[in-house]
Amino acid sequence: MPDKPTKEKLMEQLKGGIIVSCQALPGEPLYSETGGIMPLLAKAAQEAGAVGIRANSVRDIKEIQAITDLPIIGIIKKDYPPQEPFITATMTEVDQLAALNIAVIAMDCTKRDRHDGLDIASFIRQVKEKYPNQLLMADISTFDEGLVAHQAGIDFVGTTLSGYTPYSCQEAGPDVALIEALCKVGIAVIAEGKIHSPEEAKKINDLGVAGIVVGGAITRPKEIAERFIEALKS
């Protein structure tokens, strides 16, 4: 297992490359109770030249770490109804991820009500105090959320949740305007969400992002097949 990189070192590694998100949830075709599938996707991503992996759950991350030294952005998806945030939503999930020695921990940093009752700035500060050497990524849906997370000391701001909160931009494709606005104020942006084509990725890279995450367009074969099938119907 490689040493955790500094922010500067990681930014060098991610610049101009693609981080591949390798995830499957229960009910999806590539999900397996016994595991073993996500590391195969990660291996394929590495062989293609990916510069990093985004992965969900302790099990999947450990399996991926066993086959690649690529930096991992780790999350734990867990529902806390009635609250909506579910991506590394409490310190419990942060603790589990911190124990894995991964490069980056990503967490929900939207303004929605949280299970722990904290506002985002307070949550970020608590995590930074507990794990001062851990790089952190804020999954946000609007410019204001990204700014709050940045001002609270987050290392990277990801546009992961744009379109997935009721008050954010509802686009079929990536929220390029949000990505551009965050980059313009000097935030280290990891563009993520609804990036469906190499052309979109190239356009986003030219905005000066710190990194680009592509998931469904690479690692969800059902979604990829549906896109082809729907195109023939139109």
Curated annotation (Swiss-Prot):
Any Gene Ontology biological process: N-acetylmannosamine catabolic process
Molecular functions (GO terms): N-acylglucosamine-6-phosphate 2-epimerase activity
InterPro entries with a match to the protein in the record: Aldolase_TIM, NanE, RibuloseP-bd_barrel
Pfam families: NanE
Pathway(s) of this molecule: Amino-sugar metabolism; N-acetylneuraminate degradation; D-fructose 6-phosphate from N-acetylneuraminate: step 3/5
UniProt GO cellular component terms: cytosol
Keywords from the UniProt entry: Carbohydrate metabolism, Isomerase
EC number of the protein: 5.1.3.9
Substrates-to-products reaction catalysed: an N-acyl-D-glucosamine 6-phosphate = an N-acyl-D-mannosamine 6-phosphate
Keyword Metal-binding tagged: no
Cited HAMAP family: ManNAc6P_epimer (MF_01235)
Role: Converts N-acetylmannosamine-6-phosphate (ManNAc-6-P) to N-acetylglucosamine-6-phosphate (GlcNAc-6-P).
Family label: Belongs to the NanE family.
Protein name as it appears in the record: Putative N-acetylmannosamine-6-phosphate 2-epimerase
Organism annotation: Streptococcus pyogenes serotype M5 (strain Manfredo)
